[in-house]
């Protein structure tokens, strides 16, 4: 995981997938459930596709495999809290 970067209107961080199965139903569900707990907008991008971080099927639609880079972007009033929590979570589940 690269460090959290704070832009003018959002916070972003990147993560390289280490799970042998990539981003799949189980870990996508864990990310989406965690993301739903925050008010800010959360997007995840990989391979030229962008997903709503709060929607499991949207995340699975990224078709991200082991070694792929995920870019997480949070924008809203609780973006810092969301970024900190999600950054720790992805290290454990993806």
Identify the role of each PLM range.
Residues 10-19:
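Short amphipathic
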Residues 6, 20, 54, 83-86:
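Generic N-terminal initiation segments characterized by hydrophobic and/or small/turn-forming residues
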Residues 61-94:
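C-terminal structural segments of small proteins and small subunits
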Residues 12, 39, 69:
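Broad gene-expression machinery/nucleic-acid interaction feature
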Residues 16, 45, 73-75:
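Solvent-exposed beta-strand sheet faces enriched in polar/charged residues
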Residues 1-9:
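Short, Lys/Arg-enriched N-terminal segments with co-localized hydrophobic residues
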Residues 18-52, 57, 61-66:
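Compact, glycine-rich, soluble single-domain proteins
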């Amino acid at each position: 995981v690269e460090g959290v970067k704070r832009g003018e209107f959002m916070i972003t961080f990147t993560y390289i997938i280490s799970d042998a199965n990539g981003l799949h139903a189980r870990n996508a569900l864990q990310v989406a459930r965690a993301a739903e707990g925050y008010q800010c907008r959360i997007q995840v991008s990989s391979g030229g596709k962008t997903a709503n971080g709060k929607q499991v099927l949207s995340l699975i639609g990224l078709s991200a495999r082991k070694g792929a880079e995920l870019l997480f972007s949070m924008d809203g009033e609780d973006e810092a809290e969301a970024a900190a929590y999600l950054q720790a979570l992805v290290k454990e589940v993806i």
